[in-house]
C-alpha cells in the first residue's frame, strides 16, 4: 500500500520533477511533460508508460494496474491503485515513465 503523500514524494524525488495542477489534480512533469497524475479522491495514480511497459506492468494484476479506461489508456496512460500496490512497484513505474520522457528530450 502507498498513501497519497508517499506517492507524491516518490514522483517529486525524481530529478527535475515539477508538480503542477492539471485539471484540478496534481501532475508531475519533467521537461514540461506529464509523466504522472495523482487522483487523490480515487486513491490512484496515473503513470504514463509506453504500451509495452503498460502491458508488462498490467500483467502483474489487472485489478491493481490497468489502462485508463478511455482513449488515453490506448496511449500508455495506466492507473495504479494505491491501496493495493507495493511501493517498489510504483517507484519502478514512475522511474520508467520519467526515464522515457528524459530520453525523448535527449533525442531532440
What is each residue range found by the language model?
Residues 1-108:
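Charge-dense, helix-prone N-terminal extensions
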Amino acid at each position: 500500500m502507498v498513501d497519497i503523500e508517499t506517492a507524491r514524494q516518490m514522483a517529486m524525488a525524481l530529478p527535475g520533477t515539477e508538480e503542477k495542477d492539471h485539471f484540478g489534480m496534481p501532475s508531475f512533469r519533467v521537461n514540461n511533460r506529464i509523466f504522472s497524475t495523482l487522483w487523490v479522491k480515487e486513491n490512484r495514480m496515473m503513470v504514463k508508460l509506453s504500451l509495452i511497459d503498460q502491458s508488462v506492468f498490467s500483467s502483474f494484476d489487472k485489478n491493481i494496474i490497468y489502462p485508463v479506461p478511455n482513449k488515453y489508456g490506448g496511449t500508455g496512460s495506466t492507473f495504479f491503485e494505491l491501496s493495493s500496490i507495493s511501493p517498489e512497484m510504483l517507484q519502478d513505474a514512475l522511474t520508467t515513465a520519467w526515464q522515457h520522457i528524459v530520453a525523448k528530450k535527449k533525442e531532440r
